[in-house]
Amino acid sequence: MDSVMRKSLFLLLPLVVTNAHAVYVDVRHEYLDDSKANYDRAYISHRFANGVGFAIEAISKSGGDDTNKAFNDLETQGNEYTISYQFKTGDVAWQPGFVLETGNGYSTYKPYFRATWTLNESWWVGARYRFEYVRRSSDIRDDDTINRMDVWAGYKWNNFDWTIEGIYKKADKYDLYDGGKDNYEYNFRTAYIIDQWSPFVEVGNVSVNSNSDERQTRFRVGIGYTF
């Protein structure tokens, strides 16, 4: 874990100590089979009883001459800071929120609105619209905006928890996939709940780059813990 990731998580240590019963943390490794890239994430979140919640996510990637090797010369990929408010009407949870992503030479501002409908004890569905404004600090590339839509469906059975997710993005200025301004992703997640622990695996389908129509498989494995 690099110094920036450690510093980001350190900022929330008082929260973990004083509100340990309501904190969720997870760590995750990611591998892309075509680009041979490795990424790692550390995440921590908390929601208060009044509905206000916030989270910090720190992402690093393998660098140096062997980016295809996990945990090799880790470099900072970016950080995300989220604040949100959640309230319920019946079986639907509504969540307006705002995400700030910071990286090397850019910042992205992401207001969003999410709704999650609990159908019964096993099934739930959700959707989120997010507007993204990409602000660049250099003159090489202009700022850009992206409209993004996420949809989810989840099913719980005994200790298993399955989630399928679909993502659609449309940019204003720059290409995202196959020479066009549209892009999409699919993701399937399986988690197994063991008391407060939740190990999980994910398999996704994502684009390789913005110029070709090639797709690649994204593998993720991680573990979460709820205090």
Swiss-Prot record:
A Gene Ontology biological process noted in the UniProt record is: oligosaccharide transport
UniProt cross-references to Gene3D superfamilies, sorted A to Z:
monomeric porin ompg
Q: Which InterPro entries match?
A: Bact_OM_Channel_sf, Oligogalacturonate-sp_porin
Which Pfam families did the record assign? KdgM
Keyword set, alphabetical order: Signal
Q: One GO molecular function term?
A: porin activity
A cellular component term from Gene Ontology for this protein is: cell outer membrane
Keyword S-adenosyl-L-methionine in the entry? The reply is no
Q: Where does the signal peptide begin and end?
A: 1-22
UniProt-recorded name of the protein: Uncharacterized protein YiiY
Source organism (scientific name): Salmonella typhimurium (strain LT2 / SGSC1412 / ATCC 700720)
Q: Which gene encodes it?
A: yiiY
